[in-house]
Amino acid sequence: MKTDLDHLPANKQRELERVKQIIFEEFEDALALGTMSWKKKGRIDKIILYGSYARGGWVDEPHTAKGYRSDFDLLIIVNDKRLTEKVDFWLKLDDRLIRELAIDKTLHTPVNFIVHTLQEVNDGLAHGRYFFMDVAKDGIALHEFDDKPLHTPKPKTPEQALAMAREYFEEWLPSAQSFHRGYKHAVGDGDLKKAAFDLHQSAERLYHTVLLVCTFYTPHVHNLGFLRIQAERLDMRLVDAWPRERREDRARFEKLKEAYVKARYSKHYRITEDELRWLGDCVEELGRAVHAICSERIAELEARAGQNPPLAPV
């Protein structure tokens, strides 16, 4: 695996070194009180930079009208499946990375990370999942415990890839549309908390749709901000769905992000009908972008497989 970061500016290289230091500090703290044998033996086997900062083409324009900048995308590989638990081992790292970016200003680039075992990554490669194949092809190792390589990818045949993409599209998009209908009904009934939850679920499923169709992988999370970051790496049309230049726009998205838990369980959660309608328009725009991107991807796979039946209208 590549280890060279010479294509990055010196300040980005220094920043990645700082991020790596933070990862190890927080991971060691998370293991410090462990008494079980497996926890004492816990370690990080690899930290891999992937995405735009690995392959080139990153965007760093936080002060423009779009207000978009690429994240450092990191795959952290650990030696035990139990160490992938977000709440137990990685929540404090997430909080610290956000704090050092937004408050302490010791970081200037957002950091986005996922955690898997080597077996999970190699299984993804063995099943021809594009996400893991791209990581193996373009990724840059920032840390390796040993020189144990990732397995050689086994790409799916064109027919297999097409069948899987269609299956994901036909399963996940209707689910997103169903929750969007539920959101509209709930707004009409004046049940704004249910409307917020249903709209969150619609957006979440749209992101799962585009990630699964295009990469055959999606993180098993409900964090809308995290999913948005993952998906927006695929196509800039997904960025356009969410205005984010005004603080008010960003605050509305945060309310939607919180709705997965708070709209169901917190008596203090508040959202207005105007906010919901604005967010609903954004999710509709997101849905149009997802449908277009997935349709194009499936058409591309059909061409490779020598097939060309049209997608059913949605």
Predicted features by range, described:
Residues 2-35, 41, 60-125:
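Metal-dependent nucleotidyltransferase catalytic core
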Residues 7, 84-91, 105-107, 111-117, ...:
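Terminal alpha-helical segments
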Residues 51-53, 78, 201, 206:
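Generic secondary-structure microfeatures
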Residues 53, 81, 269:
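Flexible, active-site-proximal loop/turn residues at the rims of small-molecule/cofactor binding pockets
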